[in-house]
Amino acid sequence: LGISLLTTIAFFEINTINKQIKAEKNLIAASEKDLFLYRQMGASYLCIASKAEVDFKKGLGIASATFANVIIGKHGGAIKELGNQKLDQKKLYNAGTFQIVGSALNICPESIPKKIKNDYKKRLKELAKGSKK
């Protein structure tokens, strides 16, 4: 009985590991539609949190971390637009922060601190200049 139970447990663990490996191989890069959904969810969370008087930086941090975690968990950090390149947690967090603030400015501009608005606009101009080169 002990050996058959041990064999069953070992087989179950190997089977679980194989399923995880197969799942990782089947990850599909995040499309623009996926990114839009995750960005809008983050912005919605940020707006609701701000209106509930949650500290803005904490709310933005949670929204950005969730954005990054979903892309890593569901898409392995891959974004269709970038080809085979996979982004790490930090890059996705930073990209999410920028994109979530941009969307939140459209949804609830009154909830975004002035300094954050100004920083966003400045960074957007820098990116626009960089893309023209």
Residue ranges and their predicted role:
Residues 11-12, 36, 56, 67, ...:
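Phenylalanine-focused residue identity feature
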Residues 2-5, 33-35, 96:
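Short, flexible coil/linker segments at or flanking structured domains
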Residues 14-33, 129-130:
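Intrinsically disordered, low-complexity linker/tail regions enriched in Pro/Ser/Thr
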